């Protein structure tokens, strides 16, 4: 998970320590409903995790921690979910211009996050040796739910307009339209200044 270090400060991870997998999934679902960018990806990710949360509730996941052999795989699953939360939360708090520039990289991180969470879930289930037809069916349904993450079409249009401007189209108009939606109460110059300041912070972190 080291490649995700630039998603947030370690203090953000520390704040999530102590929450079990079901509670972490609830946080992700809540955060996904308020994101500004990658809305479709965030909500697909959250919907997939809701399937997992339902299965974990059936397993009484908080009780599984009592067993020594379950602690490490559960901790790995929870760690992957914490990073998943930071990924979703970054689509709310980060600079619009930064997220736009990193569009396909963020898409890749959603794919990686889902893959890692599913792998750790599978490990937890293998260790429990659950012989229950309903749970097996739920797991198969989760595995079939392979979400297609992609760069939102509207955001891609803005990125294309800025990086490869059409002589017939003024990129400023495209950007102005988008920023007016993100900052409905601010004049364009102030909104652009706010995004520029956020972008500077992101570049310093990178």
Residue ranges and their predicted role:
Residues 71-204:
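Alpha-helical bundle protein-protein interaction modules that mediate dimerization/oligomerization
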Residues 1-66, 99-102, 112, 120-142, ...:
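N-terminal amphipathic alpha-helical segments
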């Amino acid at each position: 998970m080291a490649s995700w270090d630039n998603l947030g400060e370690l203090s953000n991870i520390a704040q999530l320590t102590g929450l079990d997998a079901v509670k972490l999934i609830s946080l992700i679902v809540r955060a996904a409903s308020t994101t500004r960018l990658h809305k479709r990806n965030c909500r697909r990710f959250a919907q997939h995790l809701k399937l997992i949360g339902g299965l974990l509730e059936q397993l009484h996941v908080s009780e599984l921690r009592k067993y020594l052999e379950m602690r490490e795989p559960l901790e790995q699953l929870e760690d992957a979910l914490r990073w998943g939360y930071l990924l979703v939360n970054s689509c709310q708090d980060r600079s619009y211009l930064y997220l736009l520039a990193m569009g396909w990289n963020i898409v890749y991180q959603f794919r990686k996050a889902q893959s890692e969470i599913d792998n750790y879930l599978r490990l937890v289930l293998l260790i429990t040796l659950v012989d229950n037809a309903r749970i097996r069916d739920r797991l198969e349904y989760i595995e079939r739910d392979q979400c297609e993450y992609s760069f939102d079409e509207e955001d891609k249009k803005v990125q294309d307009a800025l990086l490869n401007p059409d002589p017939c189209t003024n990129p400023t108009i495209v950007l102005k339209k988008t920023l007016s939606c993100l900052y409905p109460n601010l004049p364009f110059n102030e909104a652009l200044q706010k995004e520029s300041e956020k972008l500077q912070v992101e570049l310093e972190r990178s």
